[in-house]
Amino acid sequence: MITLCLSALRGLHRAGGSRIRLRMTLGREAASPLQAMSSYTAAGRNVLRWDLSPEQIRTRTEELIAQTKQVYDTVGTINLEDVTYENCLQVLADIEVKYIVERTMLDFPQHVSSDREVRAASTEADKRLSRFDIEMSMREDVFQRIVHLQETCDLEKIKPEARRYLEKSIKMGKRNGLHLPEHVKNEIKSMKKRMSELCIDFNKNLNEDDTSLVFSKAELGALPDDFIDSLEKTDEDKYKVTLKYPHYFPVMKKCCVPETRRKMEMAFHTRCKEENTIILQQLLPLRAQVAKLLGYNTHADFVLELNTAKSTSHVATFLDDLSQKLKPLGEAEREFILSLKKKECEERGFAYDGKINAWDLHYYMTQTEELKYSVDQESLKEYFPIEVVTEGLLSIYQELLGLSFEQVADAHVWNKSVSLYTVKDKATGEVLGQFYLDLYPREGKYNHAACFGLQPGCLLPDGSRMMSVAALVVNFSQPIAGRPSLLRHDEVRTYFHEFGHVMHQICAQTDFARFSGTNVETDFVEVPSQMLENWVWDIDSLRKLSKHYRDGHPITDELLEKLVASRLVNTGLLTLRQIVLSKVDQSLHTNASLDAASEYAKYCTEILGVAATPGTNMPATFGHLAGGYDGQYYGYLWSEVFSMDMFHSCFRKEGIMNPEVGMKYRNLILKPGGSLDGMDMLQNFLQREPNQKAFLMSRGLNAS
């Protein structure tokens, strides 16, 4: 689902607090106030610390702000005739790197620390720094010097990436309203600060939510014993079930008691309902107002300007066309699910209401998979112990991309369950970066799956390269006595997807931090990781990823073939649900006065054909709305058009473990980071314009 980038340069990929991008440039002679931070930017080192106390976080936040502001103040007073590439554009890159690295240590702990006070201090630091980012991004004096540089320097003598950096700086200055009258700029600045705080609070509420429900063993009917044994028991000999993914989805997929599923679904989609509904009611109009002041019709128009889709009309056409193509498939899948429900109600003596409720969907989609393809995910997960999956995943990525991974002994980490790996180029031995694996749920931890970019891979002032550092943060089930953590196949797919983002972060080799890693268009950022999901549907790859946790015997070929064949199961309803979320996101960001819960309910009925549960407000739990995907959730489906085209035209055709194709992918898609437009990278790889054929086929549709 989601990557996150925590620097001031980046918006978030999946969820988490919204980041205002620090886009201004600074002069080289102004760099001295940050020399104390030079130890954080040594080439080939991971310089991140995870042991800061709440007081240290607060102190270092103020120090970072003071040091950086002094630099901006100096740059803002450079005489225009003295502005050069060297004292403006180049030094910006130096200072951005230092700022990013320090900021990461201050704002990342809110997502992963086990200490509530550290998380609180980190959240406050994030808010404070986000306000500061906005102040600095709207410094007209610095912007004037960037504009003057563009007008006076010989652009032909500047490297292409530096020229792109300059152009993007001008573009972002205008998108911040620096060309507008003073009173308008002040209004925009004030609203942006408020928007930033609202986004951080929205996702903090979700991360800190600790709602749980209590059920008897009978109320958890049909759930496997190992799952029930893993639950915390109450004094009344009942079981505590949280709303975290490792609890929620097994209950929704396997529990045969409709009332239990209803209670879980109701609770899941009313998480933070009161506070986050209020936040959305403030956030959406603020976004709309800022867009209007900047000259855009809607907030969606504002954000799409920088994406490959370019316009709301292109997005609407894409979603509506796909919805119509999937409509017959969705109807057929709903009819089959209703037949399953009717039959089960008769067998179990339940009242049959003649409809699919929201709490029925996962349950009967799971039954569909088991009946049509003889795939039982609960039994299948015994072949996916996390150690075996991790070993296989790392092996595949190393072979495919020409890399080697080495686990770091006694690594400095934020929790004892976290591991750290170093990534090297297999041919040259060059260290490219490091990544953390944080695999299990904890109280207060970010509760979805994401890749966080922590340290940018870019050039330093002395011309050496800072290595990239990323963290893969997921929430797989904890190991229990006598049994390791076992992954469902969809969790294996999630693991592959998020690790694809990690590889994008590590393999990018850019000059500027602004273009490092996953800093590409939001509707292109999922392309590399989605493409790599295809490996978990390949029989040979699955053999590398699996082994029974008890005796080590492999999955039978027959079961592997059934699993691969099941890829198309429920694809109509699953894709229609993505369209629902995309349409809701677009609607709320083209008409901020709409009621979010009502809009979601409308599209659930019209497109998915399954009504939302009355009293719930799914958008209040939808972290993407406040996490950098505002007006851009369509990007998941949009980018899958590109990822499927790449896979089927190159990897499927020439061999999915073909090292030449893997290196071509690494060099043409991953290595440029955001230094090239996404569509240019794609066409370089495909040697043609992309098309939808492979994507439509992956959805069980006729490509013609």
Swiss-Prot record:
It is found in: Mitochondrion intermembrane space; Cytoplasm, Cytosol. Its EC number is 3.4.24.16. Zn(2+) binds at H497, H501, H504. The active site is at E498. One of its GO terms (molecular function) is peptidase activity. Its main location: mitochondrion. It catalyses: Preferential cleavage in neurotensin: 10-Pro-|-Tyr-11. It comes from the Eukaryota. GO terms for cellular component: cytosol; mitochondrial intermembrane space; mitochondrion; plasma membrane. Residues 1-37 form a transit peptide. Hydrolyzes oligopeptides such as neurotensin, bradykinin and dynorphin A. Acts as a regulator of cannabinoid signaling pathway by mediating degradation of hemopressin, an antagonist peptide of the cannabinoid receptor CNR1. Belongs to the peptidase M3 family. PANTHER family: NEUROLYSIN, MITOCHONDRIAL (PTHR11804:SF44), PROTEASE M3 THIMET OLIGOPEPTIDASE-RELATED (PTHR11804). This is Neurolysin, mitochondrial.
